[in-house]
């Protein structure tokens, strides 16, 4: 299979427990129990199942306090990405490979983590530019919550996420604004805002669409070998 982002060799285990937001105890296949860094500090609603199979990466950096990082978990037969640093790595490669038809001809270069907003204290995940074209501001959101085949974001109240939506609205119409939802599991075919988890986010989401913010709910298949782009999910508003 041709992966957009191939993983290095990963280590299999079973989730024993997750605690203090940043930590997870995992029993490796050889019976050893190790403590891994959990990059996802959110509630991980529906994707933190004790006893589920997980995969870890291991760093050789002696300066790291924890050598292992929790990368993914298997929920009801589907691998779900846990590492919140993954989406931006994958989208960076996707932009380099120009795999998004609605963006392909609209940029020559792109830069990550560019300051923007009224106070320049926010950072857009990617800024795409091309002479004589509007700049494109792309915000990326890791999405793991699902109800059957419907992916939902957010999975908890997020004032930060609300702020990002408002900032995208504010840059219109002098630039293009894109909210890209990285659906970090391959079993979801549709996407909707998680109104039950953050009603205000849902309201702003619909306001953003009405104002001209472009929504890209991107489907990705994740497994221990790598990450593959599956196309766009259908937006349910």
Curated annotation (Swiss-Prot):
Gene3D superfamilies: 2.40.50.580, 3.40.1350.60. GO terms for molecular function: DNA binding. It holds the Pfam family SfsA. Belongs to the SfsA family. It comes from the Bacteria. Coiled coil: none annotated. Disulfide bonds: none annotated. NCBIfam families: sfsA. InterPro entries: SfsA, SfsA_C, SfsA_N. This is Sugar fermentation stimulation protein homolog.
């Amino acid at each position: 299979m041709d992966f957009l982002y191939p993983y290095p060799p990963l280590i299999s285990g079973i989730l024993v427990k997750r605690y203090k937001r940043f930590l997870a105890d995992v029993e490796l296949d050889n019976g050893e129990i190790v403590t891994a860094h959990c990059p996802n500090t959110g509630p991980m609603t529906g994707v933190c199942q004790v006893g589920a199979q997980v995969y870890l990466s291991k760093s050789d950096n002696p300066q790291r306090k924890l050598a292992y990082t929790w990368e993914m978990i298997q929920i009801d037969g589907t691998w779900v990405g846990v590492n919140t640093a993954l989406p931006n790595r994958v989208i960076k490669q996707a932009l380099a490979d120009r795999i998004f038809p609605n963006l392909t001809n609209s940029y020559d270069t792109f830069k990550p983590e560019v300051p923007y907003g009224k106070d320049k204290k926010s950072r857009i995940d990617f800024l795409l530019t091309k002479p004589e074209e509007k700049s494109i501001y792309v915000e990326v959101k890791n999405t793991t919550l699902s109800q059957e085949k419907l992916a939902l974001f957010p999975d908890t109240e997020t004032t930060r996420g609300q702020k990002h939506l408002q900032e995208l609205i504010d840059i219109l119409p002098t630039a293009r604004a894109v909210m890209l939802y990285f659906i970090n599991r391959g079993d979801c075919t549709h996407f909707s805002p998680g109104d039950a988890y953050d009603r205000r986010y849902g309201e702003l989401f619909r306001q953003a669409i009405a104002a001209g913010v472009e929504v890209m709910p991107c489907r990705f298949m994740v497994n221990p070998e790598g990450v593959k782009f599956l196309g766009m999910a259908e937006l349910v508003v």
